[in-house]
């Protein structure tokens, strides 16, 4: 098993070789990779079954197993995502701006690869393919470190990609997997400043916090989703019921699922029984509510301070009543993880104020937060959803994996 230094050295060499790949080269390979994923579905599912069996042995919940599980449909979706990335415009080489300065120098700012990307992620093996395809399309090498729960799946997928690269006469070190899933090795990766140009963690709050504390390499923070929906006093309550049910129950284990419900007190007594009755036909949800809201539910528990900031990733939702739009905005900005928030309202002024003042990467009016996704936003596969403000924010597609450099052409100018 190679050390982090050896993996980093190989990735750095690969990143220099990848710079010479043309758009045509990259798109042809991605089309081939999509075919290989479909062709090797049975092999991938067999390896994924090993991970699922381990999860069952360790008593992992069904919701968390869903994050880990691959199916034929999900593999086909992965292949479709790779094809979508191939179809996207190539940002590498794009001229961001160009001009001639007062000295007669022709200055061009051009989009270039980042170099070597490292990614630490949890559970979802499809991230291996999504991350690789985006990194490859932008001429970056990538080092992947998945969780121990998805090790067999990740090894199978990365081996498939490396074999496809070799068959296409492209360096297989464009992608490498760290098979040692220990915390010590992960921390070593976080500090590999000689080789890693950026580290992208994708997982729960504990992973993100560890990376923030331990990393010496540049980091793009992603993922944690304490997502709020605010039901305004001017809301269409039937619409609000539909949106909350979708955002909470469609797939609760993902980061764009709603975790916190804020309700204007003027509609609470009407809305809460409507929601409770409708959602119970779909899924039993545990409500963790403040005292005022708790009295309006037929069954709820009293929320704690920790509940209001929690990413449950389960059929659990915190509930809080407010007396005004501004109180809702203040509450959200206090507890948010800066991922996605939504307001349900027929009041245009309230909608605009909410979107202007809520400090999150994606802010919705009258729509489910489940749409915060690279595919939905037209970015193709996403490498993560950034919750920070530097470099990239929101779903990160191809442009988020690029930097720029200045090209300056003269004819003998010297500075006086």
From Swiss-Prot:
- Pfam families, per the entry: Aldedh
Respond yes or no to whether keyword Amino-acid biosynthesis is given for this record: yes
Main location per the UniProt record = cytoplasm
Q: Which UniProt keywords apply?
A: Amino-acid biosynthesis, Cytoplasm, NADP, Oxidoreductase, Proline biosynthesis
Mention any one GO cellular component term assigned to this protein in its UniProt record: cytoplasm
The catalytic activity, as recorded, is: L-glutamate 5-semialdehyde + phosphate + NADP(+) = L-glutamyl 5-phosphate + NADPH + H(+)
What does the record give as EC number?
1.2.1.41
Q: Name one GO molecular function term.
A: NADP binding
Keyword Transferase present in the record's keywords: the answer is no
GO BP terms: L-proline biosynthetic process
- The protein's superkingdom reads Bacteria
What PROSITE patterns does the entry give?
A: PROA (PS01223)
Q: Where in the cell is it found?
A: Cytoplasm
Q: Which HAMAP family match?
A: ProA
Family, per entry? Belongs to the gamma-glutamyl phosphate reductase family.
Summarizing the function annotation, the protein's role is: Catalyzes the NADPH-dependent reduction of L-glutamate 5-phosphate into L-glutamate 5-semialdehyde and phosphate. The product spontaneously undergoes cyclization to form 1-pyrroline-5-carboxylate.
Q: Under what name is this protein listed? A: Gamma-glutamyl phosphate reductase
Q: Which organism is it from?
A: Streptococcus equi subsp. zooepidemicus (strain MGCS10565)
